[in-house]
């Protein structure tokens, strides 16, 4: 079963890569540029075409169709779970995670989905008011209502109106190379590591940059490889990967890790690689994963660094995002071509805007998490031969209360995370980990965001331990209490 699953996962990924390339040929922009296109394209018909092409990837009944592939994957996963004595694949997968079972995850996601959808409905009202003005001006057909392909475009208009924030104002201050240096500065300030550029190391592509991380005494922490630029053969998304993990060898030597962050940031035709606010957060996010791998001090590689429970692994990446727009860190990297540091007024607007559109953002993420869980709560007696993927998705979305203007962040036929990347019954982990991340950051805020004692405790309690101890035990040691889920809702502006 495992061999068949590995082959099918690879096929799913290959099909999706082909579909991504087909999307670019049809629409004229790469998949990595889809969010920017949907935000800036003034032609509603083109936005609709792009949305429909994007949201139907892997679902064209052609050689790259993923419906049959994912159904075979689920059939085998349910069989495997049954053989191992579990009711479904979700309970099997979650047995050794922080959540422990599907019921706990379902309850958690429902507690997030309600406030998220309520906020999203408010956001629709605000966008519709602006669309109505476009209707009066003749720019949009009479009677038009906000559709999924309108959301990014009109959300940006609302953001400009409510926060007077235009990404064209911020991007000149977020040059990729400078943002990367800002990420490094934050790590140096928090954890005492020193990061320097190094040349002459073997790389798999000329665009990859290499860096050496050292402790204050000069001892090696690890080697970092930064692969941030879009390429035609690179799949979408962003991730951290280990070329070598930390461990102690048979002779007692501490073997240090080699880690890469891989992304597709900026526009292919932009030589300065100016980043959006979301892309800046991505750079901080992925380096949070890297720090988890670099700062670990474990004997065995199987529990070092990011080798932790799936619903714990995103804690440190998301936690690292909290420093992206702190004034002290912005001063180290956010300056334009003339060397001018980003003005305080713009920083205030950025931080105010971070809670903007969170009804949508949280709803689409939570919806994808619920879709993932419902797939993996299916049992081995499911009638796979007559299974209708579209009908299943529609019912799941209706049952969770998702509004028509939003679709899950990933639909099944291009949900690479759960069918090819090990996040099966685990996509909820981003939200689960965010509870820990936001609760921990609230503690930092109380004590001072660069408080050396708190940072030292965080490093020694969490980052150095990897997966060698129960995550909740470690969290309680650091925080002195269980994480508060309301911290996530507060951080996203879903509650006061």
What does each model-identified segment do?
Residues 178, 182-194, 201-207, 220-223, ...:
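C-terminal, non-catalytic "cap/extension" segments appended to globular domains
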Residues 1-33, 38-42, 71, 76, ...:
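Active-site-proximal, well-structured secondary-structure segments within enzyme catalytic domains
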Residues 265-284:
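Short pre-active-site segment immediately N-terminal to the catalytic Zn-binding motif
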Residues 61-69, 171-175, 271-276, 420-425:
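Extended, non-catalytic structural segments that build the interaction scaffolds
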Residues 51-71, 453-462:
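A short, flexible low-complexity segment enriched in Lys/Arg and Gly/Pro that occurs
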Residues 43-57, 96:
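Short, charge-rich amphipathic alpha-helices with coiled-coil/heptad character
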Residues 101-102, 268-272, 301:
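Short small-residue beta-strand/loop micro-motif enriched in glycine and branched aliphatics
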């Amino acid at each position: 079963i495992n061999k068949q699953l590995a082959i099918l996962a690879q096929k799913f990924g290959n099909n999706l890569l082909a579909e991504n390339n087909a999307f670019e040929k049809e629409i004229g922009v790469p998949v990595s540029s889809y969010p920017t296109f949907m935000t800036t394209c003034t032609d509603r018909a083109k936005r609709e075409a792009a949305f429909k092409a994007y949201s139907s990837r892997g679902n064209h009944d052609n050689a790259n169709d993923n419906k049959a592939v994912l159904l075979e994957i689920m059939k085998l996963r349910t069989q495997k779970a049954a053989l191992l004595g579990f009711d479904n694949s979700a309970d099997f997968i979650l047995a050794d995670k922080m959540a422990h079972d599907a019921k706990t995850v379902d309850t958690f996601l429902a507690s997030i989905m309600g406030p998220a959808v309520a906020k999203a409905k408010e956001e629709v009202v605000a966008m519709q008011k602006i669309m109505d003005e476009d209707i009066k001006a003749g720019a949009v057909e009479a009677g038009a209502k906000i559709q999924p392909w309108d959301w990014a475009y009109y959300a940006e208009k609302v953001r400009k109106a409510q926060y007077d924030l235009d990404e064209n104002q911020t991007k000149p201050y977020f040059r990729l190379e400078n943002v990367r240096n800002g990420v490094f500065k934050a790590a140096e300030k928090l954890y005492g590591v020193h990061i320097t550029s190094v040349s002459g190391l073997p790389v798999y592509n000329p665009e990859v940059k290499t860096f050496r991380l050292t402790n204050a005494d000069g001892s090696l922490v690890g080697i970092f490889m930064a692969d941030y630029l879009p390429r035609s053969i690179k799949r979408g998304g962003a991730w951290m990967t280990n070329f070598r993990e930390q461990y102690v060898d048979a002779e007692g030597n501490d073997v240090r890790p080699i880690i890469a962050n891989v992304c597709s940031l900026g526009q292919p035709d932009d030589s300065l690689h100016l980043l959006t606010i979301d892309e800046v957060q991505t750079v901080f996010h992925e380096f949070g994963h890297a720090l988890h791998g670099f700062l670990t001090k474990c004997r065995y590689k199987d529990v070092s660094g990011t080798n932790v429970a799936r619903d714990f692994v995103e804690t440190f990446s998301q936690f690292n995002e909290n420093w992206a727009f702190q004034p002290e860190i912005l001063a180290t990297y956010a300056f334009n071509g003339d060397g001018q540091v980003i003005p305080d007024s713009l920083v205030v607007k950025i931080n105010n805007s971070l809670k903007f559109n969170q009804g949508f953002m949280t709803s689409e993420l939570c919806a994808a998490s619920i879709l993932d869980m419902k797939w993996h709560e299916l049992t081995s007696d499911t009638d796979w031969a007559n299974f209708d993927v579209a009908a299943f998705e529609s019912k799941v979305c209706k049952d969770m209360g998702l509004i028509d203007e939003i679709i899950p962040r990933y639909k099944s036929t291009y949900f690479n995370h759960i069918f090819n990347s090990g996040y099966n019954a685990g996509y909820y982990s981003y939200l689960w980990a965010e509870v820990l991340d936001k609760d921990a950051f609230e503690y930092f805020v109380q004590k001072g965001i660069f408080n050396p004692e708190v940072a030292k405790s965080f490093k020694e309690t969490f980052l150095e331990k990897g997966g060698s101890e129960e995550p909740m035990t470690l969290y309680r040691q650091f925080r002195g209490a269980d994480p508060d889920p309301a911290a996530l809702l507060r951080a996203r502006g879903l509650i006061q």
